[in-house]
Amino acid sequence: MAATMALVDNVDEQHALERLLEESKPPVPAAASRLHWLLSTPFRYPPPPGGSRFRGPDDPGVFYGADEIRTACAELGYWRWRHLLDTPALAAMPTRPQTVFRTALSVACVDLRTPPFAAERAVWTHPSDYSGCQRLGRVAREARVGAIRYESVRDPGRGGCCAVLTPAAFARKAPVEQQTWMLSVSRDQIVWQRTAAVRQTELAFAPAIWGHGAGRAPSARRVRR
């Protein structure tokens, strides 16, 4: 709501603007209506052209998460950097606050890092061809598998990630914990910073870790602030 306050003169106008914005958005699916907006948002919006790793262009929503903060920061940082590359007029993106949060799941899942799935590791970790992963996502839904655990492609440490295929997978209606981090993105560096009490934590990524061309997908994934 802070972003809309800058566009109006008072709180009443802000509330009116927020209502108009909410009415213009796609409806929240009934299955996700009980959830906090941080959890329901991925199920609310259509995918980008070409889809995402486990979501085809015509598939239902997928919530993407990671086991560790560093892995989540690498994944999101990559896509923000990709957006910057697709905007030639910008040398850097303004530093913005980001909400990093933890949630709990209770659902049947498959782990692509274990047999027999591990034999197809090259398919699951391809930097730009998502066709095999999207087919698996559809098969998993048909088998009533609620989540897919897999190896991060953007984290140099290859941390664990999870694609949540259904809103029913969440054990709680809201995040368990939230933190605010500041994200700065330039063409040669992605930096995350968090200051808590007297301690500052920083995570930095150089685009070189993603290789030549950074594994460009069919289209840039839209990332929500």
Regions flagged by a language model, labelled:
Residues 1-56, 78-81, 85-225:
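Active-site and NAD+-binding cores of ADP-ribose-processing enzymes
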Residues 71-77:
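Contiguous mid-protein beta-loop-alpha structural module that forms a pocket-lining wall or clamp
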Residues 61-65:
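A short, exposed loop/beta-hairpin motif centered on an aromatic-Gly-Thr core
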